[in-house]
């Protein structure tokens, strides 16, 4: 007689479903200011505790607490606030434009604005970011033209990518923003390779790689960590844990009773787990990781704990798989509201300025959209010739494409 019970496959389940409020206790939160700040030359193994705790600076009253509460220039905080506000207003307007069938698709970053903007302001513009489709706040922090961004979304005749990328797959070299790929996890290995090349050339530029919680299940994630560790690549490896990979709960990729940051330590990489809705913590952690990279001390992995407040995309309905009011119960709050509270408390923002800035960006986005739509929209605009599909792909067109173009008669 077999002494063992039949085996059962374990499949992680979300702690909340429609009609049932989410239990967020799995997040392992601690109070602001409790996480220690190690020296930049810390050994990776000595960051194990930081990969399971949470670096937080702003408390519930809006005060900066603990060793990560750096003396940040208030102008940086103001730039961060403006970038986050602009991102949120831009996102809201573009979702409406998609519903009006002016573009085919859109993905907003509602609730995640601090992560991209905070790191963008902590890096140099010459550093290269390898983002996913939810880091448009990097572009906002670096003042990229709203008209150019909207033309890409509309796939119109002024689209710098000529309609060959999905909307929101921007490519802005002059802003240190590498071409977004629709294939998940590819940018992680690309960033490590770019960082290795920078080191080989003896340059001073570093790379910043981005990935979502779900895509960490891809093999490219593990390949990137291996190469980054072995060659001490000057790269920041960002894992945005927004709790959901489309409709799949984050534990399906990350497992239970562990963290994504813990994987970095296991690969010999100094790792942090950070409150991604705390702009001050984002900026401080990003500066720490950038300093490690610039000093030749190797890569750092940062898990940003945040929440995808909106749908995965305009093709998604999150009410089918999670509580409709989930974001209102998320314990780390709204990044804009938290930084606003802090700035007002230190005397560098006001309710009046907040309203004025909101109105400023609403007007700017509306004006940029009107200008961009003059070059066409998805529903109304120039239709490229069949010949254009062969252009601007290769510097010198190869023979097989010449033959194909001749067969089409274009």
UniProtKB/Swiss-Prot annotation:
Keywords: Oxidoreductase, Thiamine pyrophosphate. GO terms for molecular function: 3-methyl-2-oxobutanoate dehydrogenase (2-methylpropanoyl-transferring) activity. Gene3D superfamilies: 3.40.50.970. Its cofactor is thiamine diphosphate. Its EC number is 1.2.4.4. It catalyses: N(6)-[(R)-lipoyl]-L-lysyl-[protein] + 3-methyl-2-oxobutanoate + H(+) = N(6)-[(R)-S(8)-2-methylpropanoyldihydrolipoyl]-L-lysyl-[protein] + CO2. It holds the Pfam family E1_dh. GO terms for biological process: branched-chain amino acid catabolic process. It comes from the Bacteria. Heterodimer of an alpha and a beta chain. The branched-chain alpha-keto dehydrogenase complex catalyzes the overall conversion of alpha-keto acids to acyl-CoA and CO(2). It contains multiple copies of three enzymatic components: branched-chain alpha-keto acid decarboxylase (E1), lipoamide acyltransferase (E2) and lipoamide dehydrogenase (E3). Belongs to the BCKDHA family. This is 2-oxoisovalerate dehydrogenase subunit alpha. The gene is bkdA1.
